[in-house]
UniProtKB/Swiss-Prot annotation:
Role summary: Member of the two-component regulatory system NtrB/NtrC, which controls expression of the nitrogen-regulated (ntr) genes in response to nitrogen limitation. Under conditions of nitrogen limitation, NtrB autophosphorylates and transfers the phosphoryl group to NtrC. In the presence of nitrogen, acts as a phosphatase that dephosphorylates and inactivates NtrC.
Underlying gene: ntrB
Organism: Vibrio alginolyticus
Protein modification: Autophosphorylated.
E.C. numbers: 2.7.13.3, 3.1.3.-
Cellular component, GO annotation: cytoplasm
CDD domains for the chain: HisKA, PAS
Name of the featured protein: Sensory histidine kinase/phosphatase NtrB
One Gene Ontology term of the molecular function aspect: hydrolase activity
Keyword list, A-Z: ATP-binding, Cytoplasm, Hydrolase, Kinase, Nitrogen fixation, Nucleotide-binding, Phosphoprotein, Transferase, Two-component regulatory system
Coiled-coil regions listed: none
Length: 350
């Protein structure tokens, strides 16, 4: 096949396009791919696909299937991480003859911002529905627990043998334990008194608490935006939300060497928070270099009783999201092996 024709066509395509050999080495990148990956074509073609992409939400080996089947394949929801940047893409892979060899034509289209927003809103609605269900069940459990505890206390007074009170004590203790769990499931339903607070002071408290609790050496780095203004908030609740996230990261990193957490703040203009445009917002990024969150848990990570950590209760992140929601903010998460970032947005009202 004459390579000049596809080169002329591909160079003018608005779709980011790569040509790969059967070992997934990159043999060609068009100008649109240079823009997508923020690298020159010369640099791109010096790499294999696995070198260019730090992490992918699909098995890259599956991309060779068209070589055997002769048919194109398309995945409309793919995430590639390149130079630490997640790219949400629709990817189509087709067999092509290039320089007299059978190769792979990979076309990548960025997922439309509106579609991403729709996915985000749908996921948030599902999370809220799950939390409402759990809260409803928690309320149903809480009422009979009070009756059970009260009955045990009355029974204790009527027992003829004082030694039998050991059993009523067990009933009361377990009822209190269940009630405490239910209270955590319910969480605070609305924020307390809001005042103008310095977010960096709250984050410093969180950092100090986590460093004191960490049994092994974990480095916590800070990268604060000095221009970040004060924010109207319930300081205790925001501290709790941040503490849950940073503590989770520290507990996961306690099982590895050279654990590092980075807390970064930025002022963001025209932030999109659950479909609503916010003129000014604070963005807090909490990043760790731990093993990452398994892909199958990422969509349900903020649901009550879901935990990516052995021995975790599955309540910390759910509570954090609830507290941030009550401040009209949002939490996002991006994770792959060696990298997890929780991003919190809080509106700045003026």
């Amino acid at each position: 096949m004459d390579t000049s024709l596809p080169s002329a066509i591909l160079n003018n395509m608005v779709t980011a396009t790569l040509i790969l050999d059967d070992g997934l080495a990159i043999r060609y990148a068009n100008p649109a791919a240079e823009l997508l990956f923020s690298q020159s074509a010369k640099r791109i073609v010096e790499q294999s696909l696995s070198q260019l992409i730090q992490h992918a939400s699909l098995d890259l080996a599956l991309l060779t299937q068209p070589l055997q089947s002769g048919q194109s394949i398309t995945d409309s929801d793919v995430t590639f991480v390149v130079d630490g940047r997640p790219l949400m893409l629709e990817v189509t892979v087709s067999p092509i003859t290039w320089q007299k060899q059978l190769m792979l034509l990979v076309e990548m289209r960025k997922i439309d911002q509106q579609r991403r927003l729709s996915q985000e809103l749908n996921q948030h609605a599902q999370q809220q529905a799950a939390k409402l269900l759990v809260r409803g069940l928690a309320h149903e459990i809480k009422n009979p627990l009070g009756g059970l505890r009260g009955a045990a206390q009355l029974l204790e007074k009527m027992l003829p043998d004082p030694s039998l009170t050991e059993y009523t004590h067990i009933i009361i203790e377990q009822a209190d334990r269940l009630r405490a769990l239910v209270d955590r499931l319910l969480g605070p339903q609305k924020p307390g008194k809001k005042t103008q607070e310095n977010l960096h002071q709250i984050l410093e408290k969180v950092r100090q608490l986590v460093e004191l609790e960490s049994q092994r050496s974990i480095v916590i780095e800070r990268d604060y935006d000095p221009s970040l203004p004060e924010i109207l908030m319930d300081a205790d609740q925001i501290e709790q939300a941040m503490l849950n996230i940073v503590s989770n990261a520290a507990q996961i990193l306690s099982h590895q060497e050279h654990g590092k957490i980075t807390i970064r703040t930025r002022t963001v203009h025209q932030a999109n928070i659950h479909g609503k445009r916010c003129k000014l917002a604070a963005r807090v990024e909490i990043t760790d270099n731990g093993p990452g969150i398994p892909p199958e848990l990422q969509d349900t990570l903020f649901y009550p009783m879901v935990s990516g950590r052995e021995g975790g209760t599955g309540l910390g992140l759910s509570i954090s999201q609830n507290l941030i929601d009550q401040h009209n903010g949002k939490i996002d998460v991006e994770s792959w092996p060696g990298h997890t970032t929780f991003t919190i947005y809080l509106p700045i009202l003026r």
